[in-house]
Amino acid sequence: AIKQWTLPVIFRVDDSLIALQELARWWRSRLTDLRVIGITGSVGKSSTKELIASVLERDFVVLKSEGNLNNEIGLPLTLLQLEPKHQRAVLEMGMYARGEITRLAELAQPIVGVVTNVGPVHLERLGAIEAIAAAKAELVQALPLDGTAILNYDDPRVLAMREATRARVLTYGL
């Protein structure tokens, strides 16, 4: 009898973070029917994610970010949980510095971007509220021409992001 061995597959890479991200981007790109909704903001990302996912789950098979898996490690791990059965993904996109949301959007390829608000969160890293707004605006800047930006009308910094996108803009507010 021939003995079968089950050995693990091991990849040697120079940078494990880049390898994780590129694997997640590759996997996401293969799911051509998937629609991704990206959510960012200083506060309210998790509540907004839960609300959107709850509504979408009535008609679609949805994957959503678990907990606060919204950074350069968590978002790729979430993308790698996607299966061909998923029709929608609702993903939080957090940041600590400029360029991070751009990178997350490159990986996830959102068609819809929601910005909840801009507040003095991570001010110690970015230095000014305007820099925080610019970092959050990276989500709407990354949307495709046929995408949709959903912006908080009640936050002037978020509303100003309508000038930063080629996508259709919808607003919400009180």
Report each predicted region and the residues it spans.
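Beta-strand->loop->alpha-helix junctions that form or flank phosphate-binding loops
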Residues: 1, 14, 67, 167-174
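Feature captures the catalytic cores and cofactor-binding loops of soluble hydro-lyases/lyases
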Residues: 1-7
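Phosphate-binding loop of NTP-binding sites
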Residues: 6, 12, 17-153, 157-165
